[in-house]
Amino acid sequence: MSSAPRRPASGADSFRTPEPEILGPATAGFPEQEEDELHRTLGVERFEEILQEAGSRGGEEPGRSYGEEDFEYHRQSSHHIHHPLSTHLPPDTRRRKTPQGPGRKSRRRPGASPTGETPTIEEGEEDEDEASEAEGARAPTQPSPASTPSSVQFFLQEDDGADRKAERTSPSPPPPLPHQEAAPRATKGAQTGALVEEVMAVAGGTAGGDDGGASGRPLTKAQPGHRSYNLQERRRIGSMTGAEQALLPRVPTDESEAQTLATADLDLMKSHRFEDVPGVRRHLVRKNAKGSVQSGREGREPGPTPRARPRAPHKPHEVFVELNELLLDKNQEPQWRETARWIKFEEDVEEETERWGKPHVASLSFRSLLELRRTLAHGAVLLDLDQQTLPGVAHQVVEQMVISDQIKAEDRADVLRALLLKHSHPSDEKDFSFPRNISAGSLGSLLGHHHGQGAESDPHVTEPLIGGVPETRLEVERERELSPPAPPAGITRSKSKHELKLLEKIPENAEATVVLVGCVEFLSRPTMAFVRLREAVELDAVLEVPVPVRFLFLLLGPSSANMDYHEIGRSISTLMSDKQFHEAAYLADEREDLLTAINAFLDCSVVLPPSEVQGEELLRSVAHFQRQMLKKREEQGRLLPTGAGLEPKSAQDKALLQMVEAAGAVEDDPLRRTGRPFGGLIRDVRRRYPHYLSDFRDALDPQCLAAVIFIYFAALSPAITFGGLLGEKTQDLIGVSELIMSTALQGVVFCLLGAQPLLVIGFSGPLLVFEEAFFSFCSSNDLEYLVGRVWIGFWLVLLALLMVALEGSFLVRFVSRFTQEIFAFLISLIFIYETFYKLVKIFQEHPLHGCSVSNSSEADSGDNATWAGTRVTLGLGNGSSAGPAGQGRPRGQPNTALLSLVLMAGTFFIAFFLRKFKNGRFFPGRVRRVIGDFGVPIAILIMVLVDYSIEDTYTQKLSVPSGFSVTAPEKRGWVINPLGEKSSFPVWMMVASLLPAILVFILIFMETQITTLIISKKERMLQKGSGFHLDLLLIVAMGGICALFGLPWLAAATVRSVTHANALTVMSKAVAPGDKPKIQEVKEQRVTGLLVALLVGLSIVIGDLLRQIPLAVLFGIFLYMGVTSLNGIQFYERLHLLLMPPKHHPDVTYVKKVRTLRMHLFTALQLLCLALLWAVMSTAASLAFPFILILTVPLRMVVLTRIFTEREMKCLDANEAEPVFDEREGVDEYNEMPMPV
C-alpha cells in the first residue's frame, strides 16, 4: 500500500510509556472511536492518514514499473554498509525495510505513546531532537500492485513470526480482529528502572479468511540483541540483489513520500540511514531498555539467527609498525618498499644511502590527521577478520571495498593485484642468504576459481543471492582446506644478522601492523581499509622480520586526489605505535571506537605554529608542555580500575580503590612500625631469610662473575686510598692493613647474615673525618686512641640494640635532601681541601730551587745520589709517616714537589676522563663501560708506571707491612686491652665514651639507612626485599667487636653499593631504538659480595705491589672522589645560579615553580649551615660535627616550614633522583645520590 507523507514525531512523543490498551481491528471505514483507541495505543500521530488512505485506495492504484535508471539509482544508493553507532545501541533503533514483493506485510513502529509522560533517557547528554527527527523521517514501504490493503505487523520476537507464518501465505486482505484480543507487552522492571517501550502488535490474515485470523495473545518482552536476520547478509552490493529476492532494499524512501520532500531532506534521510556520520552521536539507550522489533521474512523460518563465532578476547600486545609505499624499483616495476618503521619511535629509510636514520619522535601534520580521521569514518573497517594468508586478507578487503562503493567492480582485479605485489626492505640487498620474497601464492591460480554456493560461508564473505545471476569472483581457499606447500629440498630460510639484531629490539610477543599506502592511476578516488585479524598470523614475505601481523591499513588512490598518502601513512603508523591508541584498536568493537581513540590522541597532541624557529632552545617549552599533557593523561588513566574502561563513579568506589592502594603500599613498607619490641627485626628476618637458598642459586650466572671482578677493584681502590690517608691521620695506628682486614671480615659476615646483600660496606669520608677528630681529641688529652675506640664500640652495640628494639629506623625518613646535601657537600669540600693541603705540605718539605742554587744545605750530592739510588727502599720504610720531619724521611729533594703534582693531577684527570668516556660515543658501548668502570684502577696503574719510570726523583710511598701484620707493629698489636695498653684507661672516659659513640652512631645510621633506601627504590624492581633493622644491627655490632682488634668501623658505602646493584642488573634487550633501557631483573644473591670481601682480604699478599703506590696518586683519587661526589647535589647547582642571570637558568622544577629570590634564600640557608659545620670542624670541638649535622633535621622541619610554603618545599627539597642505567653523557651513579663518598 502507499502511504501519505508523515511528519517527524517529536522527542516527547517518541519516548512516552504506553498504557496497557486493547487493540482491535479496523474496518474499511474505521469508526471514530476505534481510531481514537488506535491513536492512544500506537501513539503514531499520522496513523489515521496512513490507514484511511490504505482503506480508500486499496489495490486500485496500478503498480509502478521501474526502468534501468531506477535500478542504477538503487545500486548506487543501497550498497553502503550500515555500521552501528555503538555496541550499546539496541537493535530496534536500526529500522529495516522489507521489499515490496507479493504477500509482503508492511510494518511500522509506534512513534509515540498515548500517555503524556515524558521519560528520561539514560544517556542524559544526548540531543533528543536529533533522534526524534530521525525516527519521524522513516517512511512506509511501497506495496505490490497486486496486493490488497494489509495490516501493519509488529513482531517482538522470533516466535511471533513463527506463529503468524500461516497468516502470510495469501495476498488477500485480512479480516477484522476482535477489539479485545490484543494484550499489553510487559512493562519496565522495577529493579533496573530502565525505560520499556510498550509495543502492541496488530495481526493480519489472508483475504480469503481461511483461518479467520489469529487470536491475539500477550506479547513477551523481546530479548535484547535478537534479530530475525543476520546483519552479515546485508554485506552485498546492489547488483547482486534481485528485485524479487531482495531481502533488504536500501532505497531511502518510497516514491510518494519522496515527491513531497525537498532534495535536502532526501539527502539528509539517505545520510542518516545509510552512512556513519562522524562526530554525530545518536541516543545511546541500554539494550534492556527497549524490546526489539523483529520481522519474519517470506521463504525463511524465523527461528534463531545463526550467529558468527564469538570474538576471542583481545589482549593488547606491544606493536611493531612497518610503513610500505607503492614505488617503482630499478626495473620500473611497482613494488611495496619499506620506507619507515616504528618500534616506539620513528625510523626512516634515507633515500640516498638506503640505511636507517636515527630514531626520533614523529612529527605529523595536522591536516594528515584530519584526513586520516575522515578516511576512517567513510572507509572500510573489518574487525576480527578470520583469514590466515595475505591473499585471503586481500580478497576480503577488495570485496569490502566493492560493497562499500569505494571502488568499481571492474577495478577489483587491479586492486587485488596491487595488494599482492612484492615487498622489499632496505636490508634485502645486505643479506646473502636465501631471499625473503617467497611467493605466497600464484595470482593466476586465483582468477579461474569459482565460489561454491554450497560451501560453508564465512561471516565476512559475501555469498550470492539465491536465484541470482552467478558472477565470476576471485576467491582464495582457506588455509585450513589446503596443506601448506612443502619448501624445495635443500633450501632453508635462515635469519640474517640484521633480522636477529632487530628482533632483539622488538618486545617479546609483539604483534605487527602493516601500513600500505600508494598512488594508483586506475582508481578515480582514494580507497581505504582498516583490518584487524581475529588472530595474529605471520604473513610470508611481507615484514622485514618474522613477526605475526594483527593489523593492516591500506590506502590507495590517484595522484590527482588532494591527499598526501605518505603523511597519512605516517599518521596511522604513529597512532598504532601510541600505547593508548593501539590498546583502543585491540578492544574496538566498531568504527566509532577508532574515531574516539583518534580524538583522544588529538587531545594530547601539540600543534606548532607555522613560524620559523631560529634555535632549538625555542622548542624547550614544547617538550615541557608535552610532558605536562602526558602526565595529565597518565593521571586520568590511573583513576580507571584495571581491566575496566570506566572511572570509579561513586565515592565508595574511589575510597575502596584508595584503600587498596594504601594497603599495598603499607604491606611492602619495611620501615612500618609494628609497636612490638624488635618487631621490625623479626619482620626483616621473616621477609628475607626464606630466600636464603635462592641467594646462592641465583649466583650461577656469568654476569655475577663479571660483577665480582669489577666490584673487587671498586672496593679495593677506596680501601687503599682511605687506608693510606687514615695512616697519615693516626700516625699509622690504623692504616692499610687494618682497613683491608676490616673490610674483608665484616664483608664476609654481612654477606652471610645481612638482609640486603647488595650493600657493599666499607670506609667512607665521614668516618675518616671522625677518626681524625677523635685522634686529635685523644692526643690533646693524653688518652690512648685505640682503647677509647674499644669503649666507643661497646656503647655502639648498646645503642644499636636500643634503636632496633624501638624500631627507630623509621627516623631515616626525616633526613631529607636538605640535610643530605649539606652532609655530602661538606665531605666533598673536606676531600678537596685535604688534597691541596697535602700537596702544599709537600711543596713546603721539598721546595723548588733555581738551577744556580746548590742543594748542599740540605744534603750533599752523594747523599742525593744515595736517596735517588735507594728511593724504593726509603719509600718502603718511610712512605706513610705523618710525624714531624726527621724520622729518616728526606727533605728538600729536587723535583719531588713537581712530580707529586704531576702524579696527583694525572691520576685525577685520567680517572675523571675515563668516567666521561664511559658515556661517550667512541667504541662500542660494552668496551666503553668496561673502560669507564675500571677508570680508577687504570689511573692508579698508569701513574704508578710513570713514577716507576722516573728513577732519579724521590716520592713518598704507601706504607704497607710485609705479610699478615699491623701497619706499625712497634706501636700496637692485633688485640687491644680495654683497660689500657701503656697505662690505666680512666673510668670517667669509659662512661664519657657514650658521647662520641652517639656521634659515630649518627654517621653510621645515616649512611647505612640512606644507602639502603637508595638501593630499595621501587624503580630497581628488587623482589626479595630489604631489612633496615637487621642490616643496621649487624653493621654496628660488627664495628663494636672490631674495635677490640683495633680495626676501623665501617658503614654501607653509597657509591660502591649502587655500583654493585647496577652491575647485577639485567637490562632488557628488547629496547626500542631511542628508548631508555628497562630493568628485566636484578641478580639478588650473596655470592658476589662474599667473593669480593675474600678477594679484598687476600690483597694483603700483594703488599709488594701496594708499596709502589705513591701517596700523591692517592691524593689524586681523593680529589677525584671529592669532585665527582658534587654531581647530583642540587645545592651545588643552585650555587651556580647565584652567579647566573635568570634567563640562563635551567628548565628544572625548583627554578620554574619557585621565585628566584625565594630559591636563593633557601640556598643561602643551606650555605649558612655548611659554614657553621666547617667552623665547628676547624676548632677543637670538631668531634661534635655529627651532632651539629643532625640538628639540621629539626631545622628543616620546624624553621623552614614557617619560611617557605609547602609547595616551595616540595620543589626545593624533593628527592627526584632516579636510578641511572642509560648512557647519558656526564651522568652516572654519582648523580643518583646526594650522599658523601
From Swiss-Prot:
UniProt keywords, alphabetically: Anion exchange, Antiport, Cell membrane, Glycoprotein, Ion transport, Lipoprotein, Membrane, Methylation, Palmitate, Phosphoprotein, Transmembrane, Transmembrane helix, Transport
Residues recorded as bearing Phosphoserine in the entry: S113, S132, S144, S170, S172, S239, S439
The keyword rRNA processing is assigned to this record: no
Extracellular side: 843-893
Transmembrane segments: 705-725, 750-770, 792-812, 822-842, 894-914, 930-950, 985-1005, 1032-1052, 1086-1106, 1109-1129, 1170-1190
Membrane-side (Cytoplasmic) residue stretches: 1-704, 915-929
Catalysed reactions listed for this entry: hydrogencarbonate(in) + chloride(out) = hydrogencarbonate(out) + chloride(in)
Lipid-carrying residues in chain (S-palmitoyl cysteine): C1169
Gly residues biased stretches: 205-215
Organism domain of life: Eukaryota
Modification Phosphothreonine, positions: T253
Feature: compositional bias, Basic residues: 76-85, 94-110
Membrane topology annotation: Multi-pass membrane protein
GO cellular component: apical plasma membrane; basolateral plasma membrane; plasma membrane
PTM-bearing positions, type N6-methyllysine: K270
Regions of compositional bias (Low complexity) in chain numbering: 137-151
Family: Belongs to the anion exchanger (TC 2.A.31) family.
Protein name stated in the entry: Anion exchange protein 2
Species per Swiss-Prot/TrEMBL record: Equus caballus (Horse)
Classification of source organism: Eukaryota, Metazoa, Chordata, Craniata, Vertebrata
